[in-house]
């Protein structure tokens, strides 16, 4: 009979907390913007940051900045920093990097998207539904860029 792996060798992942770290909404050209025909140009910038809070405990912050222009004028600017505290223990380095750089942001994104949508509606603009983001693909692109930079420096 095969022995089970020791309990302390098992990987552990858990969500400890999801929280709103920072939020900003600006509509610099209101109320004039409400009188114009609505043909928005939406720009989304996103970034993630991670830091270790303790052994196996990490804070991940997903920052989304949405800038919407209408007829070349800024209709609104919305920035949300959605944070999470996660336990990620007993993972190899590559797996931990993927967890912190892609898996955790995937968990945080729906919360940030909902906050942005709510702020936009409260600003009395048409609802903004952000498309899903493929954080796995973004993380893979990041790894490829890091590898190319390493080759260029060598």
UniProtKB/Swiss-Prot annotation:
Keywords: Chaperone, Cytoplasm, Protein transport, Translocation, Transport. GO terms for biological process: protein folding; protein tetramerization; protein transport. One of its GO terms (molecular function) is unfolded protein binding. GO terms for cellular component: cytoplasm. It is found in: Cytoplasm. Its main location: cytoplasm. Disulfide bonds: none annotated. Signal peptide: none annotated. It holds the Pfam family SecB. Belongs to the SecB family. One of the proteins required for the normal export of preproteins out of the cell cytoplasm. It is a molecular chaperone that binds to a subset of precursor proteins, maintaining them in a translocation-competent state. It also specifically binds to its receptor SecA. PANTHER family: PROTEIN-EXPORT PROTEIN SECB, PTHR36918. Homotetramer, a dimer of dimers. One homotetramer interacts with 1 SecA dimer. NCBIfam families: PRK05751.1-4, secB. This is Protein-export protein SecB. It comes from Vibrio campbellii (strain ATCC BAA-1116).
């Amino acid at each position: 009979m095969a022995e089970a792996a020791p309990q302390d060798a098992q990987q552990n992942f858990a969500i400890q907390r999801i929280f709103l770290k920072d939020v900003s909404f600006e509509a610099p050209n209101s109320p004039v913007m409400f009188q114009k025909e609505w043909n928005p140009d939406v720009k989304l910038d996103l970034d993630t940051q991670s830091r270790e809070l303790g052994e196996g405990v990490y804070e991940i912050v997903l920052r989304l900045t949405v800038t919407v222009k209408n007829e070349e004028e800024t209709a609104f600017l919305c920035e949300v920093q959605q944070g999470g505290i996660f336990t990620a223990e007993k993972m190899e380095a590559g797996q931990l990097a993927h967890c912190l750089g892609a898996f955790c942001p995937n968990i945080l994104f729906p919360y940030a998207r909902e906050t942005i949508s709510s702020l936009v509606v409260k600003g009395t603009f048409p609802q903004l539904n952000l498309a899903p983001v493929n954080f796995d693909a973004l993380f893979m692109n990041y790894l490829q860029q890091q590898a190319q930079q390493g080759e260029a420096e060598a």
